[in-house]
UniProtKB/Swiss-Prot annotation:
Its main location: nucleus. Residues 195-263 bind DNA. One of its GO terms (biological process) is chromatin remodeling. It comes from Schizosaccharomyces pombe (strain 972 / ATCC 24843). Keywords: DNA-binding, Nucleus, Phosphoprotein. Pfam families: HMG_box, INO80F. One of its GO terms (molecular function) is DNA end binding. It comes from the Eukaryota. The modification Phosphothreonine is found at T314, T315. This is HMG box-containing protein C10F6.08c. Residues 68-195, 236-341 are annotated as: Disordered. It is found in: Nucleus.
Length: 341
């Protein structure tokens, strides 16, 4: 037959001490778990912030590059300061022909004010002539002054006629007078064409010709290769240089379009990341709520366990059953079956 289990008697103070130690260990475990959860949440927030910062930096760098190109084009087209305003009595009309090119703007002087000045000068000359005929000259100096005055009137009239009969005076470049047509696509193409220099065209030509020379088996390098390319470029005519000019424009437009597309992709990616982060925050909030509910349930069960009454240990000696002999060993009582049984 199997031996019965050992019966161990524990004092009340030891049992209370063990219970208190168990409570302390559970409280410590819960405190450590709570601290770990807080550290994990902080780490997740910092990781998302770093990722968002990197994306925003990439987008800002793209926008800065586009703005710098626009500013460089604007400053490249900025011309000399505008001339002083015309004198009073002269109206300036700006023709709308060739508004895309600032150098094609012309000033037209209206003849309204000049005709009025001619009429006034003619009237004054007639009055002075009549007065000179009616009145007898007293001195020779008076006649001389009248003659000088008439000559001045004739000179002024001849100048006015020349101004009205001549072609419109070409105006200098005026930066402040910009029409709506200058903001069209044609004006943008003109600005891009004006910005391209001979050095840029030569570099584009070199980038195209170098692979061709290498494929043909040329061994030129360094200054010799550069000299050959320069001689070839200088021997080309304007018509032969036109394809390289158009190719450079197409390449720059392609690069600009690629930058715009990259910027749009980065912005879309940032929006997706923000949406994912919002969804993750919601999920994390739900997890924290569920964890809190579980912790509350555990604490509630712990309180119920703590509130249960502790049974006091019996102080009466443990009597062995029949046919069993008690054996005392230290603080324990071991019951063995007798040999008679």
């Amino acid at each position: 037959m199997e031996n019965p289990p050992y019966h161990v008697s524990i004092s009340k103070s030891e049992e209370i001490k063990y219970r208190q130690k168990c409570k302390d260990l559970k409280a410590r475990i819960q405190e450590i778990q709570k601290g770990n959860q807080e550290l994990l949440s902080k780490y997740e927030v910092i990781r998302r912030a770093v990722k968002r910062g990197r994306l925003e930096r990439a987008i800002l760098m793209e926008q800065l590059e586009l703005q710098s190109e626009a500013k460089s084009r604007e400053f490249g087209q900025r011309s000399e300061p505008s001339p002083p305003p015309p004198p009073e009595g002269i109206k300036i009309k700006i023709s709308t022909k060739g508004a895309g090119n600032p150098s094609a703007k012309k000033l037209k002087i209206s003849t309204e004010e000049t005709s009025d000045t001619n009429v006034a000068l003619n009237n004054t000359s007639e009055i002075s002539h009549k007065s000179s005929n009616n009145s007898q000259p007293k001195d020779a100096s008076v006649n001389d002054t009248d003659a000088d005055f008439e000559q001045q009137n004739q000179v002024v009239q001849s100048k006015d006629e020349k101004i009205t009969n001549t072609d419109p005076i070409p105006s200098p470049i005026i930066t402040n007078l910009k029409t709506e047509s200058s903001k069209s696509s044609g004006a943008k193409k003109a600005t891009s064409n004006a910005k391209i220099t001979d050095t840029m065209l030569f570099n584009h030509f070199s980038s195209i010709q170098k692979p061709k020379l290498k494929a043909e088996g040329s061994t030129l390098k360094g200054q010799a290769l550069k000299k050959t390319l320069e001689d070839t470029w200088n021997n080309l005519t304007e018509e032969e240089k036109k394809p390289y000019h158009e190719g450079l424009l197409a390449a720059r437009e392609k690069a600009r379009e690629a930058r715009r597309r990259r910027s749009a992709q980065n912005s879309a990616k940032l929006e997706k990341e923000k949406a994912k982060e919002k969804q993750k925050d919601k999920d994390q909030e739900q997890d924290t709520v569920s964890d809190k509910n579980q912790i509350d349930e555990i604490e509630k069960g712990q309180k119920e366990v703590d509130e249960e009454p502790v049974s006091e240990p019996t102080t009466s000696p443990i009597l062995p059953p029949k046919n069993q002999e008690p054996i005392r060993m230290g603080g324990f009582t071991v019951v063995n079956r007798s040999s008679n049984a």
